[in-house]
Amino acid sequence: MPAPSTTLLIEGSFSELADEFAQYIDALRKTEPSLQAELSPLLEPLRQQEQSDAEPDRKQRDEVLKKLVSAATVLNTAPEKEIISAYNLLVHLVHHASDPDMFLSRICSYLAKPITSSPQFGPSLAISILSTIFNTLPATDSSRYHVLLAIVAVIRQSAQGVAFEALKPQLTAQLPTWLAAWELDEDEAQRLHLAIADAAQAAGDQELAQTHVVQALQTIPAADASKKEARDLAVRALTSALSHPAVFDFTPLTASDAVQALRTSDSTLFELLEIFTADTLDAYEAFVAATPLASISGGVLAPAADALQNKMRLLTLASLAASTPSRSLPYATIASALRVPAEDVEKWVIDTIRAGLVEGKLSQLRSEFLVHRATYRVFGEKQWAEVQGRLMVWRRSLENVLGVVRSERERFIRENLQAAQAAEEAAQGKSGDKKGDRRQRRDQPQQSQPAPEAATAVAAE
């Protein structure tokens, strides 16, 4: 898989290595005329330049490489243990060309084909060689585009889920950077996205496949939106999104010029998109009754009839939850909107929660769903009116709460003042009582004490 930069360490001059590679090709082909003999007149001037340390003739090298690369198709028949080293030698030689890209794209096309000498391990060998090529190129080199295409093609043809899983993190983290660095045009970017989508689909990753189909759709210029190729891609993206169980946001599709062009070329399919974008199960069932799925765009959606109806139920419940002012949905209301038995309501609510469309709590005791959060499928004038209504309700509630808080605050202050006043009066009352007692004691005359003599006399008696 693509990784940090790699350097191939191969000893020898260009002429020596080219002659050695030609001998190897002759050994594999076992036919006449000899490639080595054909290259000898071209290699001799290069050999002399190398010996004299003169500047090599790049045009002469390119002529040699043209013959070597043309004959390299035979490498896919080489013994399994020799394939990697043989291709590495060829890649090393190609890096001496005036424009390596004109040769690397052809080498990549060879590696995208089956390696007949190793049916079992051929894809792994090809991916290993292509990864080496990719990593020997500078990060900004547009030649990497052809190499990545070949890697993705090998993975798709071999249906190697493990190989795709190894490549997937690189695609997620690096692909936008690569595309910007390579400066691809719309056609090249579209081709790469579709190749990745095909590989992801072969590996069973429907979500990533859908993502890259939509990205491929976004590369179509507005001027080309009505062309057959654009129409085919728009139909593919739309049918994939409608039938995919995890795709509920259709905004990227409705924003595409190619999808908008379906309003003319495939009006019933576009009408179905509008229903899934903003309408409910009632509208969907009425549409299907009047326009069977088998009659829409060649019947591409007919096999997904059950999946479409199930998705429409989830979307309907999301719309119902989003438009309920009280944030409480009785089971009976849900059952009626979804056309399901009352005993199945909780199952559908749970499925909608798992899809990330709503959040809330089921109350079996009260037979209702308490909505905490709901996803708006579209957000227009109606939704703004709903938001305004809810904000007004919250405002009135907050005003009531604020009134209660103010009343309680005033009561608290009043009671504190009264308590403080009472405490002060009580303190003043106690102080007055103490002063009166002291005054009373001062005003009372002191009792005379008996004379000592009298006391003594009494004691004597």
Curated annotation (Swiss-Prot):
GO terms for biological process: formation of cytoplasmic translation initiation complex. PROSITE patterns: PCI. Residues 42-61, 422-461 are annotated as: Disordered. It is found in: Cytoplasm. Residues 205-376 form the PCI domain. It comes from the Eukaryota. Residues 431-444 have a biased composition (Basic and acidic residues). InterPro entries: COPS7/eIF3m, eIF3m, eIF3m_C_helix, PCI_dom. Keywords: Cytoplasm, Initiation factor, Protein biosynthesis. It holds the Pfam family eIF3m_C_helix. Residues 445-461 have a biased composition (Low complexity). Its main location: cytoplasm. One of its GO terms (cellular component) is eukaryotic 48S preinitiation complex. One of its GO terms (molecular function) is translation initiation factor activity. Component of the eukaryotic translation initiation factor 3 (eIF-3) complex, which is involved in protein synthesis of a specialized repertoire of mRNAs and, together with other initiation factors, stimulates binding of mRNA and methionyl-tRNAi to the 40S ribosome. The eIF-3 complex specifically targets and initiates translation of a subset of mRNAs involved in cell proliferation. PANTHER family: COP9 SIGNALOSOME COMPLEX SUBUNIT 7/DENDRITIC CELL PROTEIN GA17, EUKARYOTIC TRANSLATION INITIATION FACTOR 3 SUBUNIT M. HAMAP family: eIF3m. Component of the eukaryotic translation initiation factor 3 (eIF-3) complex. Belongs to the eIF-3 subunit M family. This is Eukaryotic translation initiation factor 3 subunit M.
